[in-house]
Structures are given as structure tokens and as C-alpha cells.
Amino acid sequence: MGVLESEEKVVDIPKHTSKLSAIVDFYLHSNNFRSLSAKSQKDYEKHLDVILKTNVEGRLLGNYTVRSIKARHTNLAYEKWLVSGVRTANYRKAVLSAAWKYSMRLDVMDNDPVRLIKTKSTKPRKVKWTRDQVLCFLDTAYGNFKWRSIGLIVHMAYEFAQRVGDMRILTWDNINFSEQRVDLTQSKRGADVHLPIPDDLLSMLRQQSQDFG
């Protein structure tokens, strides 16, 4: 029997007779999972736990075997996840799909009942600012000393096209003043990115470092 080694324990490659809970456990000890950011790992674990505990036709979804779980079961589970909202239900489908496909690529199974879940579409929740609105915000933030930190966060997010949350947790160690570059790890994808800092933003960062660094 094949195994994958983890720092915590050795995990056997599941069989088609294994339960869904074993498929999830196998994924949680994979390099694919470990490559995610710490926040994403925590979110995946939380939602996968809910998925396994979802009652479908009198049984917990996690107790279904790989060969017995059908599209009917995954769609019924999805309907229950919708109680928590469309976005949450779709997120749970996505994380379950990641776990399922990890084993599927190792020929544990050849069917994909997760892919057959009929999802509902969500309404876009992102509000897009115009360039003028961003500049107006920055003028206001930089015009008041107590708001300057907020202005810098938004300024960096705008210039680097990165998530505001990632900008908020940057430290001075992420800023390479001599190379005029910011080095960071994206929270969502876990990717390392290295971005040039424009002159005007660099000037503001130097001032902030002098005042608070």
C-alpha cells in the first residue's frame, strides 16, 4: 500500500472502499494542503469538518464510502449548506472538490460527484472605485496625520493590485527600501510576490518609517 509521509504522521493512500472522512484526512496531510496560507488552511479545516458532519439521508456525509457516494448525496448536502448562504455553500463545494480531486489524481476513484453539484450564482459584492475616488480618499487620509496609516494601506493595495488585508499585515521587513521593492506572501494563494514601489509611495513609506518605524 502506498503512503504519504507527513511530519505529524504517515497517511495511507485511501482505497475506493474508504470513507469520505479518510479522503479528507489524506488531503489535510498532503503537500497541496500545506502549500496553502495559514489562514486558508484554517478555513479549509473548519469547512471540511462541517462537510463531513452534514447529515444526508440519515448518515453523515463523512461516513459514506468513496464508491457509494453519488451526485445525489453531494447535491443534497449542498442544499443544506445553502442555509449558511450561497457564498458559504459554494466555498464548501470548492474545498471538498480540492480534497476529492487530490485522491482522484492518484486513481483512488474515477468519478466526481462533487463536480456534479448544481451551484447557485452569487451577486457580485465588490464595489469598484474609480481612480478619482481613490485619489480623493488618499488626499483625505494623507491630509490628517491620524489617518495616514489607513491611507498607506489603501495606497499600497491600489498601486500593487493586492488585497487590502495583505497590505494591512505588512511589516517593515517586507519593505526593501534599497531595492525599492515590497516582498510579500499572498494570504489567499500562498504565492510569494515581489513588487516595485513607485517613487511617490516610496516617499510616503520612508516618512512613515521615520515617524513610527
Regions found by a protein language model. Give the residues of each.
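Hydrophobic (often cysteine-bearing) scaffold residues that line and stabilize catalytic clefts
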Residues: H16, L20, S40, Y44, ...
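Basic, Lys/Arg- and aromatic-enriched nucleic-acid-binding interface segment
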Residues: N90-R92, R105, M109-V164, R168, ...
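A short, basic/aromatic helix-end/turn motif that makes direct DNA contacts
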Residues: I169-I175
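A structural signal for short hydrophobic/aromatic patches embedded in well-ordered alpha helices
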Residues: Y44, A77, F137-L138, L205-R206
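N-terminal core-binding DNA-recognition domain of tyrosine recombinases/integrases
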Residues: G2-P14, D25-K39, D49-R125, L138-G143
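C-terminal catalytic core of Y-nucleophile DNA break-rejoin enzymes
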Residues: S187-Q207, G213
